[in-house]
Amino acid sequence: MDRYLGLARRDARRLFKLPKTERVRLVATHGRSISGICEYTRDYQSTVKLNVDLRWTWPALRDMAAHEAYPGHHVHQATREWEYLHGDFPREAAVSLAACPMGPVEEGIGENAMWFLRWDRTPEDRMTLALNRLRWGTEVNLAFMVHRDEPRRELLRYAMHSGLVDWKQAVRDVRYARNRTWASYAFCYWYGTAIIRNQFLKMDGDPALFDVLYWRPHTVRTLAAAFRRL
C-alpha cells in the first residue's frame, strides 16, 4: 500500500499543483466495519486507515491509494483547505459531511480517481473498476430491499449473487445497507461516479474538468450546472 500511495502521489502531482507540505500517513486497523478511510486533519495532512483484516489484491490496493488519497479524498480536502485559506471558499465549504448534497461529488471523485490517473489500462485495473461499480449498484439495491423489510437471508443471497462476493463480504455489505446513514450514502457512490465519469470521458481528461471539481465547492446541482458551462 505504501508503494501505491507513492506512485499515486507522483502521478497526481502531474495533474495538480499541491502544497509541498502535504502528506498522507498510512495506519493499519483491525476489526473495523470499513475497508479504508481518509481522515483529513489540517495543514494538508491526512491519515489513511486500511483494514488489514480483509483480504487485499494488489489492484484493490492501487484503487484504495487513489480513492482515499491521490487524487481522491486527501487531494480534494487539501485543495479545499488551500482555497479556504488563500482563495474565496466560504468556511462551510471546507467542511465534509456524510450523506449530504456534497456526498456524490466527494465519492464520485474518489471512485474515479484511478481514471484521473489513467490507471485503467491493465486488465486487472479495469476489473477492479468494474467490480467497484458492481459493488455500489448492489448496495443501492440492498438499501431498497432493506426499506421493503425483506428477510436477511434474501439480502445475503442477493449480495453474494449480484456483488460476486463471498459470505463474509456479503455480511459486511448487508450490515452497511441496514445502517440508515450509510445506506443513503450508497447512492452517493453510485450516482456521483456516473455523473463525473461521463463528463471525464466526454472531455477526455481536459484539465478544465479538475478546475471545476477540485477548486470550487459543489453540490450535485451546482456541479451539473458547471458541467453544462464547460
Predicted features by range, described:
Residues 167-230:
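C-terminal, non-catalytic "cap/extension" segments appended to globular domains
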